[in-house]
């Protein structure tokens, strides 16, 4: 009888060990976008932002601006270096993007469509200057 109890206890121990070890294994798949794919997301926000500003729909432009800026934030975190960039993306953001984004944000808060349009044009020009600086053959359009 004692041997039978040991076998049962051994099986329980084995079962618990298998369950424990299988719970430790996580095979999570993460989608990792490269810079080009992330820029495509950014482009969608940027183009729609321009459409809303041109139409004078500043409330809609506001959430698009925040979405676009959140994509910029992710790019700053993710691309501290990249083969297409001479430095971290955050330096380009700070030098080129921060001012037009602040300008558009302020214009939206003040409900100033003219200033929002000026900020948007500045944003597009800064995007294109960054592309030229890094020999990227893609233009951002108004």
Please annotate each region the language model reported.
Residues 133-141:
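Inter-heme linker and motif-flanking segments adjacent to c-type heme-binding CXXCH motifs
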Residues 2-13:
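Bacterial N-terminal signal peptides that target proteins for export
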Residues 25-122, 140-142:
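Extracytoplasmic c-type cytochrome modules immediately beyond a signal peptide or single-pass transmembrane anchor
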Residues 21-23:
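C-terminal motif of bacterial Sec signal peptides marking the signal peptidase cleavage site
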Residues 14-19:
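Hydrophobic helical h-region of N-terminal Sec-dependent signal peptides
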Residues 123-134:
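The canonical Cys-X-X-Cys-His
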């Amino acid at each position: 009888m004692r041997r039978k109890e040991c076998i049962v206890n051994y099986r329980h121990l084995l079962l618990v060990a298998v369950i424990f070890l299988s719970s430790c294994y996580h095979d999570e798949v993460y989608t990792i976008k490269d810079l080009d794919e992330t820029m495509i997301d950014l482009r969608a926000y940027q183009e729609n932002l321009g459409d809303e500003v041109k139409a004078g729909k500043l409330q809609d432009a506001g959430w698009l601006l925040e979405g676009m800026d959140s994509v910029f934030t992710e790019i700053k975190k993710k691309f501290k270096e990249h083969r297409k960039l001479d430095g971290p993306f955050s330096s380009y953001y700070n030098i080129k993007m921060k001012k037009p984004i602040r300008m558009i944000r302020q214009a939206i808060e003040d409900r100033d469509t003219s200033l929002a349009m000026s900020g948007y044009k500045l944003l597009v020009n800064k995007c294109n200057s960054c592309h030229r600086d890094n020999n990227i053959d893609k233009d951002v359009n108004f």
